[in-house]
Amino acid sequence: MWAEGLGGLERFCSPGKGRGLRALEPFQVGDLLFSCPAYAYVLTVNERGNHCEYCFCMCCFFNNVFQSSQKEDWPMHKLECSPMVVFGENWNPSETVRLTARILAKQKIHPERTPSEKLLAVKEFESHLDKLDNEKKDLIQSDIAALHHFYSKHLEFPDNDSLVVLFAQVNCNGFTIEDEELSHLGSAIFPDVALMNHSCCPNVIVTYKGTLAEVRAVQEISPGEEVFTSYIDLLYPTEDRNDRLRDSYFFTCECQECTTKDKDKAKVEIRKLSDPPKAEAIRDMVRYARNVIEEFRRAKHYKYILYNAPPSELLEICELSQEKMSSVFEDSNVYMLHMMYQAMGVCLYMQDWEGALQYGQKIIKPYSKHYPLYSLNVASMWLKLGRLYMGLEHKAAGEKALKKAIAIMEVAHGKDHPYISEIKQEIESH
């Protein structure tokens, strides 16, 4: 085991969960439990030209720091630069393939244990191979084929079975790095962060400072308590959350939130009508909502809709689905909120600031009710609202919203995080 360990924390065997992380000392809300540099990471293709590929910073991309960053990242930069030149416009490996290529390169360059692996090594990651269905196995084989296709001249590969294990490990243990508005920046592996088990009422939150993951308490944690993070978006009711957990992580959550289902009624709130909808009508509408959400998720993933339909048609789909669901669901129902959030995103893309603001105003109150107290989803919504208000010359409302975002982010990100300094500057500059 890595000699340093993590101060105030220990790896232990969590009953019914396997490996876990446990506190050895008390932590207060906002305390930094530990930080973990990325073992391997990759900037998403869409952010090239906006962020430094070495540190994910925006500012160093536009000044002299970029040259030193590029020098530091040269071994990984070279891994992609040469094949990009060779393949040109045909260079299109998935982010998972790119990340896995970097892991293989890192293992060759740095075979010994790294500072990212103080309590958990990459080779110890769970793969859940025995739980993969044929569809997931086929996807992994497609990724392996892409890895060979794009990187065969620049990497040495282990045998196919070893690559299957590695891709399965990356799928279960990879992290998405997001900015202050929860926009996707890239993907990474943080071994010690991956040691934490999941709960739908987590006591810590993971945020990022460039390619460094930071874990802070969002509840008081006593010595002997297990440290829990959340692997998923907590907006949805128990059944939906566990469907996602089973599909991606191969377990069913048994936390207090999932056992009591206390918030489910409010999350799937039904309209109060003189002639209340029947149980069958409610079930049908829930089924419709889940199907619409899944269709949108797939469309966004494959970019099908963006290539085949203008944004106005996307917005129409959002509006029609809301109209249909509103015959049964209240506006505070999470399925309604999901489609409102999608609509807000389309409005932002179309630069329809008034439309985006109207959706954000509808979303923020139920978000604050459904999500935990220190939620990044709530903070990012306040942040978007604040920036919209400021842009539309509603300074007082904008300042109020931005300060609400800061109050959450000071706990989740830490008071010294660059994002918070930037938001404070936004307030001062108006």
Where are these regions (language model features)?
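Short alpha-helical interaction motifs and adjacent low-complexity tails used for partner binding
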Residues: 1-64, 68-430
